[in-house]
Amino acid sequence: MHPRFQTAFAQLADNLQSALAPILADKHFPALLTGEQVSSLKSATGLDEDALAFALLPLAAACARTPLSNFNVGAIARGVSGTWYFGANMEFIGATMQQTVHAEQSAISHAWLSGEKALAAITVNYTPCGHCRQFMNELNSGLDLRIHLPGREAHALRDYLPDAFGPKDLEIKTLLMDEQDHGFALTGDALSQAAIAAANRSHMPYSKSPSGVALECKDGRIFSGSYAENAAFNPTLPPLQGALILLNLKGYDYPDIQRAILAEKADAPLIQWDATAATLKALGCNTIDRVLLG
């Protein structure tokens, strides 16, 4: 078991501990539960889906990286496939506050980058901030997404974001988590191809500036993140953050990164290079390359 889970795990009910122990045994537990695993946990504990998600939130929050605030937020995004995806907030010392990842963004990106097609619900241990409510409004589940908070009845996103502004106001038809392929040819080595593939999946209807980042770890594992724009612009999630979300949730740390590649267009209206390089250098990665999409 990864050390970060030990404290939270010890506080779980005995029957949940017994059912989870084999799943958490791998130090690189992928921070997700398949539909089959969810069903097994429900059977072992007698909990329904909502109660189980709340019980698991401390494990999601244990994935938080909060050296600045020390305020750990956990989220669990429930995919329509039946898979549950953990998420947690991340702060980056030496970078800017704007590079921060919120727990809801983490769980949603985890699901999206894992190939999930849509979300049915999200469970969070604290009320979503306005930034996250706006981020969620970009999803193809829209204002119908169910939000579950401790001690409250579940409500749809529309209840947390009345008079919402979103992609439909800008006549955007393709939404976040819809399947997209921008068709750039995969060239170069495996890391370059992973970055290009991530750029191909970008959700960037506002700027038309595709980008993707791929991180190579010392053991050869590659994590890639795609750019995810938002109708309100500021809640946009850069591609580096997508890759760092996966790296963190899969049990890796920043010193494990040995090389990074950003794929983007040289003439795009928005450029990721400076912010990507600065944040990676703050995390200790200095081997950073750029592949230009043609």
Swiss-Prot record:
Keywords: Hydrolase, Metal-binding, Zinc. The active site is at 104 (proton donor). The keyword Metal-binding applies. Gene3D superfamilies: Cytidine Deaminase, domain 2. One of its GO terms (cellular component) is cytosol. Zn(2+) binds at residues 102, 129, 132. GO terms for molecular function: cytidine deaminase activity; identical protein binding; zinc ion binding. Pfam families: dCMP_cyt_deam_1, dCMP_cyt_deam_2. CDD domains: cytidine_deaminase. Binds 1 zinc ion. It catalyses: cytidine + H2O + H(+) = uridine + NH4(+); 2'-deoxycytidine + H2O + H(+) = 2'-deoxyuridine + NH4(+). Residues 48-168, 186-294 form the CMP/dCMP-type deaminase domain. Its cofactor is Zn(2+). It is an enzyme of class 3 (hydrolase). Substrate binds at residues 89-91. GO terms for biological process: cytidine deamination. Its EC number is 3.5.4.5. The keyword Metal-binding applies. Belongs to the cytidine and deoxycytidylate deaminase family. NCBIfam families: cyt_deam_dimer, PRK09027.1. Homodimer. This enzyme scavenges exogenous and endogenous cytidine and 2'-deoxycytidine for UMP synthesis. This is Cytidine deaminase.
